[in-house]
Design a protein with these regions (language model features):
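Conserved hydrophobic/aromatic packing and binding residues within compact polymer-binding modules
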Residues: 42, 53-57, 67-70
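Residues that mark the N-terminal boundary/hinge immediately upstream of a DNA-recognition element
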Residues: 41, 52, 78-81
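DNA major-groove recognition helix of helix-turn-helix/homeodomain DNA-binding modules
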Residues: 61, 80-96
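N-terminal flexible/basic segments that precede or flank functional cores
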Residues: 1-40, 102-112
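The alpha-helix within a helix-turn-helix
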Residues: 46, 57, 86
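Recognition helix of helix-turn-helix/homeodomain-like DNA-binding domains
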Residues: 60-76
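Short, amphipathic alpha-helical "recognition" segments used to contact nucleic acids or chromatin
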Residues: 39-47
Length: 112
């Protein structure tokens, strides 16, 4: 399912149309939700630390475009990148994936 198809389906749902269950839509929606949660946490923590996107990219040895993609939720990075983000931003990231449960991402900054 591409973004346009997802957006059209979401729009139809918001208009109150009854739509048949679509596992692909649910998967894309879930991934987008996780990406947005992570992106907001990364942006907030980066700003809290007074870092620019370039500073964070340098700490992680990635391109600035990679940081922008994470913060704007255009991509859900693999676990290895999430671990590098956690180290670079001094965060604890807990990803809970359990069959049947909604996946959760908990991001905790150290107490000030």
């Amino acid at each position: 399912m591409n973004h346009s198809e997802w957006r059209t389906r979401r729009h139809r749902q918001l208009l109150g149309e009854h739509l048949d269950a679509d596992p692909e839509y649910d998967r894309v929606y879930e991934e987008a939700s996780l990406a947005m949660t992570l992106g907001k946490a990364v942006y907030d923590r980066r700003k809290q630390l007074g870092l620019s996107e370039a500073d964070l990219a340098e700490r992680m040895h990635v391109d600035v475009d990679d940081i922008e993609g994470i913060e704007t939720a255009t991509e859900l990075p693999p676990i290895a990148v999430i671990m590098r983000l956690a180290r670079a931003l001094d965060l604890t990231v807990d990803v809970h994936l359990a069959g049947g449960d909604e996946p959760t991402v908990t991001i905790v900054a150290p107490a000030a």
